[in-house]
Design a protein with these regions (language model features):
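ER/Golgi luminal nucleotide-sugar-dependent glycosyltransferases, focusing on the catalytic module
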Residues: 1-186
Length: 186
């Protein structure tokens, strides 16, 4: 939590958390908290989701019930179109050295995803904003894949003894969300 003012009942600075990394991870600190404190310990809810302070998925209770009835795995926001492709988009928000660090982390940890990523970067669709509603197991699997990549990216991109205060991990997370769900779309 970046503020002492209480604005919600549940915060990302209790239990197992990375709340102090919020300046870089943005809303992904809340996803980490959900993964470690809800997805891994409770078996009550079938679906979990992440919205954040100014971004949310506009879905009604009836829509959620229909998702459950139709056994929908994942709900993502409409993808944003970036012409000519999403590789152009990331250069506005992400330093090339950080992008290269993420690609290196992918190659080290998940080489099959790294190979597919080059293909996905050439298409125009990006699922922005790190927003999702998904079945428990799918979201848990995504987190188990995502956070080791982000941790390794941080190790490769942050010079020793230097503290960063930008949103680069959050922006990289948007690209990784797109990769993960495009990779698993088939």
């Amino acid at each position: 939590a970046l503020t002492d003012q209480r604005i919600t009942e549940i915060t990302d600075d209790s239990g197992e958390n990375i709340s102090t990394k919020n300046v870089n991870y943005c809303e992904l600190t809340a996803l980490y908290w959900m993964w470690k404190n809800k997805l891994c310990v409770e078996e009550t809810d079938k679906y979990f989701g992440l919205f954040h302070y100014r971004r949310f998925l506009d879905i009604t209770d009836d829509g959620l019930m229909a998702m459950k009835a139709k056994n929908v795995d994942v709900l993502l926001p409409y993808p944003l179109l970036h012409e000519p492709d999403i590789s152009e988009h990331h250069s506005r928000y992400i330093e090339e050295s950080d992008w290269d660090a993420m690609l290196q982390a992918l190659k080290e940890l998940y080489p099959d995803y790294a190979e597919r990523f080059q293909e996905i970067l050439r298409q125009p669709y990006l699922y922005n904003y790190n927003m999702i509603i998904a079945k428990r197991e799918i979201l848990k699997d995504y987190c188990e894949w995502l956070f080791p990549i982000l941790k390794r990216t941080e190790e490769l991109s942050t010079p020793k003894g230097w503290e960063r205060a930008d949103r680069y991990i959050g922006y990289l997370g948007e690209n990784l969300l797109t990769l993960y769900f495009m990779y698993h779309a088939e």
